[in-house]
Amino acid sequence: MITRDDALALDAADPLRAFRDRFHIPDPSVIYLDGNSLGMPPKRTLERLTEVFHDDWATGLIRSWDHWLDMPQRVGDVLAPLIGAGPGEVVLHDNTTLNVYQAVHAAIGLRPGRSVIAISADDFPTDRYVVDGIADALGFAVRHGFDQLDDVAVMVRSVIDYRTAELVDVAAETARAHAAGAMVVWDLSHAVGAIDIDLRGCGVQLAIGCSYKFLNGGPGAPAWTYVARELHDTIRQPIWGWYANEDMFAMGPTFRPRPDIARMMLGTPAILALAAAEVGIALSAEAGMPAIHAKGSALTGLAIDLCDQYGLATPTPRDATQRGNHVAVQHADAKAFVKELTAQGVIFDFREPNIIRAGCSPLTTRYVDVFDGLAAVARLAAR
């Protein structure tokens, strides 16, 4: 039987344990297992925002744009190694929904003559809604499932299932789609900062993701887009904004896209949000994705073992190589449980129809948090 002392022993031996002290945790009695929805705030974030406010905005005023202009690409270069991308292949901008729209539209443009978009019927809602909207506007067909790809222009997939945490074989599925002549847009929102992934090594050409979950970038933090360097000269995204223009200050009559990743941008970036996101991204870079992934696998492994111990059902894969950094607990009263536990300071989240998600954010989640959280669920289930 796993005991609380076992969890405390794992915490004592955790090579990443010191990172938790670098986050603002005003109430240590709160058990937070929802970093897969919103990460905790790093202490450095407030300091960094104060610096940008005082030194750049208040003191530098408009002159600060001299070093703000390329900030989306600079922060993208900090993020790039976390996903196996190269310098100049990632840019932070806008939000995930808009970036999905851009990437899918751009991918369609690279496959003329094809008019089918493939996506899972139970993928994350915003991805499905965007795909449906694009298909409606262009007169395309939406196919739910990936068995037939020979007539597909673009396949849209999440790396990790947002409910069960099942991890897709990105390399194999990318190769299969490319062999059928289809483009692929990968959504890494539940993967970035959680698993050690090599987009270049997997042959991925287009990907998007957020920075407010495992990267701890803050609520509403900017999303990001990855475009493999070999596509930079040919990819055309559908929203032509001045920030993506080759000479943005020429104010010319026509749009000519920039020759690099910045062609995926739109308008003026949110500098304060970028500054906050950079702090969280840099912390993950400092810890290193191999160590983060290893701890995430151990945390979720403990959660699954505790589910077994308490007789709680979970659809999350037991093979650590096939799951992300949350564990789904199924119960008919899941929604009521989450509401009651939240009131007690034990924070999970709920997903329809019957899932309690236990998010394990390796830089902040302790093994004892997992133990106490699952024990609290078990007490409610036993009533």
Features from the language model and the residues they span:
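Pyridoxal 5′-phosphate
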Residues: 1-383
